[in-house]
A protein has these predicted regions:
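Residue-level recognition of beta-strand->loop/alpha-helix junctions
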Residues: 8, 46-50, 231
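Conserved glycine-rich "GG(E/T)P / GGGxP" loop and the immediately following alpha-helix
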Residues: 11, 22, 74-86, 230-233
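Short glycine-rich His-centered loop
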Residues: 2-23
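Radical SAM [4Fe-4S] cluster-binding motif and immediate context
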Residues: 25, 184, 189-233
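Structural cue for short, hydrophobic secondary-structure segments
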Residues: 6, 72-73, 226
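Glycine-rich beta-alpha loop elements in corrinoid/cobalamin-binding modules
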Residues: 29, 33-40, 45-180
Length: 233
């Protein structure tokens, strides 16, 4: 089976204010996706950008893990990822270029990629999973799309995808999937992939206590006028 390296592009170090505040949390959305792949029988690894120095660390992980597929799965539970989209995009594109240089296929899932798939596909991503990606990822793995690319017709039968059938072709967007209602159907997050001790040390050093994230639902009950939600829906 293909080894899959999961990752995301929120580098805490790139945000000076938040880096100084030093309140890092593991990438919940990313490790849930990794758990979905693990439940499908895949070997998984994690590149956690939150605590990494730069995109160069991702290339080091590529060499060390030797994956057959990279999945950049942004942590949509982290509100900070909505406030730093341009910097996140820059980092993600560098990471995709690194995967392409090493001959590793890549898929992307995230808020920015859902709205603007073109730059990610241009940078080397084979697919963008738009909207919630859990079921789309499971569907792709069920069809063994991680082992070898499917043809455009087969991809066209899978909801929740953006792809370019050819190098100069227009982007094809398949129908959006319904929002997942039964969150209990998802596997428990793959916490073992995270360096929890590193998070604990940082919290204790800077705050004298340790805080860890959990999620009990999806969506947001608030209506902040500065948020992307009123703009993009």
């Amino acid at each position: 089976m293909t080894k899959i390296l999961f990752g995301h592009a929120y580098f805490l170090r790139f945000d000076r204010k938040l880096f100084e505040a030093m309140q890092p949390y593991p990438p919940m959305g990313t490790i849930v996706a990794a758990a979905v792949a693990r439940a499908a029988g895949r070997e998984v690894a994690l590149f956690d950008a939150m605590l990494a120095e730069s995109e160069r660390a991702f290339e080091v992980a590529l060499v060390a893990e030797k994956p057959g597929l990279v999945v950049l799965y942004e942590d949509n539970f982290n509100y900070l990822s909505k406030m730093c989209l341009s910097r996140m995009r820059e980092a993600a594109l560098v990471m995709l270029a690194a995967a392409r240089r090493h001959g590793v296929r890549s898929w992307v899932c995230g808020a920015d990629a859902s709205d603007h798939p073109e730059p990610y596909l241009d940078a080397g991503a084979e697919l963008v999973l738009h909207g919630e990606g859990d079921e789309t990822l499971a569907d792709l793995l069920k069809r063994n799309a991680d082992a070898a690319p499917l043809d455009a017709e087969e991809y066209g039968q899978i909801a929740g995808l953006c792809l370019r059938p050819g190098s100069k072709a227009a982007v094809v967007r398949t129908p959006r999937r319904a929002v997942l209602r039964d969150l209990d159907a998802l596997p428990w997050p793959a916490w073992d992939l995270c360096d929890i001790d590193h998070y604990r040390r940082l919290w204790l050093r800077h705050h004298g206590r340790f805080s860890l994230n959990l999620v009990s639902t999806r969506g947001c009950p608030f209506h902040c006028n500065w948020c992307a939600k009123p703009i993009w829906g």
